Amino acid sequence: MTRVPRGYIARRRRAKMRSFASNFRGAHLRLNRMITQQVRRAFVSSHRDRVRQKRDFRRLWISRINAATRIHKVFDNYSKLIHNLYKKELILNRKILAQVAVLNSNNLYTISNKIKIIN
């Protein structure tokens, strides 16, 4: 049986994979089979970590808010602050609260005073 040269289609497919692997090193950049394996692995990792990133940032924001509320004695802890915010219908997301707690603690006092005044 004669050898069939696989025209431009296979080259185009491999070139596309190679463009994804442009920042890899060593054999991961040069060998086609290794390139496909590593690119597939990189895509799996990037998808997994995009999902995990949301979880990690939420945990970071919660721990920052909790630390700020305990240090500045705004409330006893994070859960009481969030409970009172929802009870008084002052909906602030955790990202904004964490930024306020870290960058400007005076505004955290004003938020807590709003909650206490509404009581």
Curated annotation (Swiss-Prot):
Q: Which InterPro entries match?
A: Ribosomal_bL20 (IPR005813), RIBOSOMAL_L20_CS (IPR049946), Ribosomal_protein_bL20_C (IPR035566)
Entry annotated with the keyword Ribonucleoprotein: yes
Entry-linked PROSITE patterns:
RIBOSOMAL_L20 (PS00937)
Q: Which UniProt keywords apply?
A: Chloroplast, Plastid, Ribonucleoprotein, Ribosomal protein, RNA-binding, rRNA-binding
Q: Where in or outside the cell is it found?
A: Plastid, Chloroplast
What is the role of this chain?
Binds directly to 23S ribosomal RNA and is necessary for the in vitro assembly process of the 50S ribosomal subunit. It is not involved in the protein synthesizing functions of that subunit.
**Name of the protein in its database record:** Large ribosomal subunit protein bL20c
Which gene name belongs to this protein? Answer: rpl20
